[in-house]
Amino acid sequence: MSFTFAIIGRPNVGKSTLFNRLVGQKLALVDDTPGVTRDRREGEGRLGDLEFTIIDTAGLDEGAKGSLTARMQQQTETAIELADALMFVFDARAGLTPNDRAFADFARRANKPVVLVANKSEGKAGGIGAMESYALGLGDPVQISAEHGEGLSELYDALRAIMPEPEVEDDDEEIDGLTEEDFSKRPIRVAIVGRPNAGKSTFINRLLGEDRLLTSPEAGTTRDSIAVEVNWKGREFRIFDTAGLRRRSRIEEKLEKLSVADALRAVRFAEVVVLMMDSQNRFEEQDLRIADLIEREGRALVIAVNKWDLVEQQGGQIAQLRADADHWLPQVRGVPIVATSGMLGEGVDRLIDAIQDAYAVWNTRVSTAALNRWFEQAVAQNPPPAVAGRRLKLNYVTQTKARPPSFVVFCSRADAVPESYLRYLVNSLRGVFKLPGTPVRITLREKANPFAHKRKRKS
């Protein structure tokens, strides 16, 4: 069982910077604006030979009951309950504030080991602030600079002192490599994206059965891409809830630009992407832009039309959604569409089934024999057009990879094959081998002519 630390403290003391430093990558947004982190996020931390789970939390701050700030504090309290020990972080340059003192009491009442971290300890002011912290009664402060990586050896000593001795692994249990069965047990990486306030976090909370992610009628509540582990009927998923993606012209605030970049990274890391639309405003321009991005990144796509409980006269609406999707998104024709209600918990089973089906399609490999039978029939049924009086010759096709399914067609003149004919081949292949909603790549390549050098020498 992994040892878990929760990083706590008031807003803007450098908790997310420390989190990023310990996990070794920028998983949490960092900005000078207080309150950047809203949800709690988890990562696998490492410091020297120490390995542990680490939870980054929203800054502990006061807030009216039911407000976004109060719910941020509730997330922090939950993180403290889950943790084995706490890292209480304060800003040594700013010195102790009344909030630091109040929440130091809060940390003490948790009755868990506490590592007092004096962040931003560079310079004389930082040293003075660190000395002040003895008044908190939480032991010796560890003076660090999370931004510059200073003081990490001292932090290592403090963490090592409260962590249990690592268990010695049995040498007989070495893993030589993943089998097909092992691969099938890997968590499917899923990103849930969409415009702001489409209901992404509400839906994931319904899936988890807990208020794991902050939700609010205010658009843009989620700022980071938050990853959660889900076991649904024996299948593991790693689901990323992302910040809403707006049109570039509307992304004005620096912090929102960071959030959008974080969401795009989640899409690139995912295997299946769920594009969540609001049932009251579906297939708007930004939805289509997001779908196009997902296709260009080569990810499997599932469309979830959320807040379906708000739709009046639902009969026939799904058929209309299918027609709209195939019209506006021909590049992923047949994309799975699921009507959901995160608020009521409707459509969860159907969406999970659609994700698993999309993942299977994304991993499709077609046998060479079946592929070439299709190819011969497709070319015979609709031959490529002639160019300058000479018919193009398409020789054969081969699959180069899955994830997404990608193929190479060898032909006489690759640059002369029109885009319309390439689309014909993609749609035909998609229909015959049942590849709905996943990007299908076909690349044209000219077959080497073994007699070309002889002709060249002759002339």
Curated annotation (Swiss-Prot):
InterPro entries noted in UniProt: G_ENGA, GTP-bd, GTPase_Der, KH_dom-like, KH_dom-like_a/b, P-loop_NTPase, Small_GTP-bd
Binding, GTP 1: 9-16, 56-60, 119-122
Highest taxon of the lineage: Bacteria
Stretches assigned to the KH-like domain: 364-448
Binding site for GTP 2: 194-201, 241-245, 306-309
Pfam families: KH_dom-like, MMR_HSR1
PROSITE patterns: G_ENGA
Gene Ontology terms for molecular function: GTP binding
Keyword list, A-Z: GTP-binding, Nucleotide-binding, Repeat, Ribosome biogenesis
Domain EngA-type G: 3-167, 188-363
Coiled coil found in the keyword field: no
GO biological process: ribosome biogenesis
Gene3D superfamilies in UniProt: 3.30.300.20, P-loop containing nucleotide triphosphate hydrolases
Function statement: GTPase that plays an essential role in the late steps of ribosome biogenesis.
Assembly and binders: Associates with the 50S ribosomal subunit.
Family according to the record: Belongs to the TRAFAC class TrmE-Era-EngA-EngB-Septin-like GTPase superfamily. EngA (Der) GTPase family.
Name of the protein in its database record: GTPase Der
Annotated source species: Rhodopseudomonas palustris (strain HaA2)
The organism's taxonomic lineage, starting at the top: Bacteria, Pseudomonadati, Pseudomonadota, Alphaproteobacteria, Hyphomicrobiales
